[in-house]
């Protein structure tokens, strides 16, 4: 808990410079979308910047700050839930499932074929095979 307090203070000071710090904490920061907690706290690099990307995917998924600082961050991000309606500030880190992935828990990026090259290739091959077969069948029937 002490860490949280420390982070909060740190975030406040740093964010203040950005000019979004205060607003962020209340509006975007709260969910870590802007970088309020996750922002500095994590290294999320300023989750703000990442969350700011609007694709929270980048920041949220990257989970740099999330996993870096503490899984608890997920909790903060949760605060963003109500702010999810925000274009790119709230949803990113707040929703956590922006790309259908849980940044804090999963830890791996949604679009990272290198994570499971075999699985990815298998799936792709299967799809291709099926498609090809279907196509061939249609052609034959025609």
From Swiss-Prot:
UniProt keyword annotations, A-Z: Developmental protein, Secreted, Signal
According to its UniProt entry, the protein's GO biological process terms are: gastrulation
According to the UniProt record, where is the region Disordered? 75-142
Question: Which residue windows does the record flag with biased composition (Basic and acidic residues)?
Answer: 107-124
Chief location = secreted
Q: Name one GO cellular component term.
A: extracellular region
Task: Respond yes or no to whether keyword Nuclease is given for this record.
Answer: no
Which intervals carry biased composition (Basic residues)? 125-142
Disulfide feature: none
Q: In which compartments does the protein localize?
A: Secreted
Annotated signal peptide = 1-16
This molecule's function is given as: Likely to be involved in the establishment of the head.
Tell me what this protein is called: Protein spalt-accessory
């Amino acid at each position: 808990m002490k860490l949280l307090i420390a982070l909060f203070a740190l975030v406040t000071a740093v964010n203040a410079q950005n000019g979004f710090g205060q607003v962020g904490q209340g509006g975007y920061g709260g969910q870590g979308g802007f970088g309020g907690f996750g922002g500095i706290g994590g290294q999320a690099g300023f989750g703000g910047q990442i969350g700011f990307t609007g694709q929270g995917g980048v920041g949220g998924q990257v989970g740099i700050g999330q996993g870096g600082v503490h899984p608890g961050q997920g909790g903060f991000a949760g605060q963003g839930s109500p702010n999810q309606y925000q274009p790119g500030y709230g949803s990113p880190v707040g929703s956590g499932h922006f790309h259908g992935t849980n940044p804090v828990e999963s830890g791996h990026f949604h679009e990272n074929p290198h994570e499971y090259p075999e699985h990815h290739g298998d799936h792709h091959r299967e799809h291709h095979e099926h498609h090809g077969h279907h196509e061939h069948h249609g052609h034959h029937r025609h």
